[in-house]
C-alpha cells in the first residue's frame, strides 16, 4: 500500500530544512547577555511541576489508554517534576540552531498497580532535540524553513489522531498528569509559504515498557490558513508495529480537517469538521468523524456554547474485516478533546466503537478564571462487538474550573457525575451512579 515514491518524497523534505513543531520552542532573542556562551547564543532554565488529588465514589473503570484491565482505587495522588534547559544560537544571516534537554520524574500513590501506577515512580529523559530554522533569510518569511530531530513533540490539528508522544500510568506513574509528551524519536520538517504549510515527519512513540507495541508512523501534512480563524488540513500517515498491534502494522490513515469561522461579519459562529479513514485490508477497515458548531456570546463572562457529534466505528463480528477504529495517539487539546469525559474518556471508554453527543458551555468570569460544564451522551456504534444488546452506555456531566493565580501557578478543579445506561448494566452488572473529583496544582517557571 505504501508507495516508494512517497517514501522518497518524504525523505527529500526531511533532509531539507523545514519547521519543527516542538512545544514552546525557544524564541529568538536579541539580548546582548549571552550568559557566558559564544556571541549569538542564549539559553534559559525550564522548570514545571504538578500535584493532584483524585477521588472516586463507586469506582469501576479500567484504563483504556494502554489496554490494562483493573478497577480503580477510591482515592489516589500523583505528581511530576520536569526540569531542563533550552537555547538558541544565531548564525550570521543563516537562521539559527535551537534545542532543549529535560527530564521528567513522576510518582503515583495509593492506586492499584496496573491502572494508574500504584506506588509507581519513574525518572527519564523527556526533551532531547536539535533543530534549525531559517529566520528571515532568503526573503521567504519568518522561519519559513525548519527542521528538528530527536525527542520532541508533534501535534496534529486538535488531537483526534496524533497529539501525545509519551504513554503514562502503569510502571511510570503520572496517569492523569500527562507530563511526558515528547516522542521517543522524531524527525520533523516544515516549509511555510504564505498561508500554506507542508510538513513531513517520522514519529516513534515513547510507550510503556510493559505494553510497547513499537508503533511508529511517517507521513505528510498539508495545511492552508488564510487567517487565524480558518484552517483546512489534510494528512496521510503510514504505520508500523509489532505483534502486540498487528492491525496497526501496515496501516494507512487519511485525515481531513476544517476549523472555520466562515462568515466574517459573524465571528461568533464557528465550526469544526474532521474525518479519518483507516485501511489495512481485512486487519482494519474503519473510519471516524466529528462535527462541532459553536457560538460565542458577546456578554459578561464571554460564554461560548457548543455542540459536537462524534462517531468512531466499531467492529461488526458478522464480517471478516475488523472495523474497530484505532484511536492512535490522541491527546488533551482542551477540556473534552480528545479524552471524552473525565470519567468515561479517562478511565474506561476509548475512541473506538463509540458515538458521543457533547454539549459544552464555557465562560470566563475574569482574566484569571475559566470554567464550564460538559454534558455527554454515550452510545456504542456496534453492540454485538461489545457483548451487549443495548447501545446506551450512559450520560456524564463534568464541571471544571481553571484558576490562574499568577504567572507561575494554576489550580484546576473537576467534579464529575456518570449515570450508567443499560449497556453498562449488562456488561458489569452495575447500575449505581459514579462520582469523581480532582484538584490539581501546576507550577511553571
Give the residues covered by each predicted segment.
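Cleavable N-terminal export/targeting peptides
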Residues: 1-35
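Beta-barrel outer-membrane channel/assembly domains of diderm bacteria
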Residues: 22-147, 187-193, 256, 263-270, ...
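Active-site beta-loop-alpha junctions enriched in small/polar residues
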Residues: 50-52, 152, 203-205, 237-239, ...
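Outer membrane beta-barrel
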Residues: 79-207, 215-219, 223-226, 231, ...
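Internal metal/ion-chelating core segments
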Residues: 191, 195-264, 268, 273
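A short local loop/turn or secondary-structure capping micro-motif enriched for an aromatic residue
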Residues: 206-208, 241-242, 314-316, 380-382, ...
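Short, well-ordered secondary-structure micro-motifs
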Residues: 245, 317-320, 383-386
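Flexible glycine-rich, low-complexity coil/linker segments exposed to the extracellular/periplasmic environment
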Residues: 318-353
